[in-house]
């Protein structure tokens, strides 16, 4: 089973008219809300400082973008950039939570911010400090009465829990690399996990010793997502197109978004840290692959 690339890829490119996004646009979070696709993308200008831009579209392929970033470095710990946004809609609470990586010369910090309108964001705080930790994403509902989030302590995917999104604990490893496989060096979370009757469908990325990124998927227990139910040996996508193979980071495809609309999974991804592409598949097909593949 493989994802199907959109023929019009890439769907978002750098905009030379705006300095803050003139060099690279990539690694985006996307949600579908009120009939629209809302995209939050990482952008870089010639200063290589990452900022987060916003774009919106009705069909999932064509987007109109704001001319100014909606999130940019303001704190010392994010002086070199705010990166790789993943956005979760907490529908029962009427708010959205963005997980993003703050970068400074002092290291990286996995941060959370919240919004009620998708444009104005208020920082909540970090998942953890003082360690190399990123690729975090919030689950779309509480599990056992607590918020849950994936994160990455290299080289593995971990999970953590919180009562208030500010204080995190109960850290548990979910899964790590597999020797001699496509995900042999490290793994990291993808977009927001998808709840199904068979478990949490969790797309993720893997990285091998030849420095190639690929996408995979696993199935996790609904009430204990640290328990892996199934993890196929094969991947669902690898770099093939020229713009996926050549760029700021060669052979890199990186997804932080997989919204489901009318039974279709839309997988948005950065291509070689330069542009944004889209691939898709039927949710039923992806779930079957995760269970049986």
Per-segment meaning from a language model:
Residues 83:
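Acidic-residue sensor for enzyme active/binding pockets
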Residues 1-80, 89-185, 194-251, 261-265, ...:
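Beta-rich carbohydrate-recognition and catalytic domains
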């Amino acid at each position: 089973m493989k994802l199907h690339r959109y023929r019009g890829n890439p769907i978002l490119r750098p905009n030379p008219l705006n300095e803050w996004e003139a060099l690279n646009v990539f690694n985006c979070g996307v949600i579908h809300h009120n009939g629209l696709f809302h995209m939050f993308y990482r952008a870089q200008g010639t200063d290589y400082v990452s900022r987060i831009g916003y774009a919106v579209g009705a069909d999932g392929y064509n987007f109109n973008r704001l001319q100014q970033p909606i999130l940019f470095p303001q704190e010392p710990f994010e002086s070199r950039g705010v990166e790789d946004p993943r956005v979760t809609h907490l529908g029962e609470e009427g708010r959205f939570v963005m997980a993003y990586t703050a970068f400074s010369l002092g290291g990286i910090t996995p941060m959370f911010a919240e919004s009620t309108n998708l444009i104005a964001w208020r920082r909540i705080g970090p998942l953890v400090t003082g360690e190399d930790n990123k690729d975090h994403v919030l689950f779309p509902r509480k599990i056992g009465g607590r918020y849950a989030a994936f994160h990455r302590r290299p080289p593995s995917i971990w999970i953590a829990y919180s009562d208030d999104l500010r204080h995190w604990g109960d850290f548990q490893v979910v899964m790590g690399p597999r020797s001699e496989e496509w995900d042999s060096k490290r793994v990291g979370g993808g977009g927001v996990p998808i709840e199904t009757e068979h478990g949490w469908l969790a797309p993720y990325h893997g990285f091998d010793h030849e420095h190639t990124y690929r996408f995979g998927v696993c199935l996790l227990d609904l009430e204990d997502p640290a328990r892996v139910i199934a993890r196929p040996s094969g991947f669902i996508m690898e770099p093939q197109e020229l713009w996926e193979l050549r760029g700021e980071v060669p052979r890199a495809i990186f997804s932080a978004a997989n919204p489901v609309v009318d039974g279709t999974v839309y997988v948005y991804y950065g291509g070689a840290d330069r542009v944004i592409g889209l691939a898709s598949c039927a949710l039923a097909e992806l779930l079957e692959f995760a269970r049986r593949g």
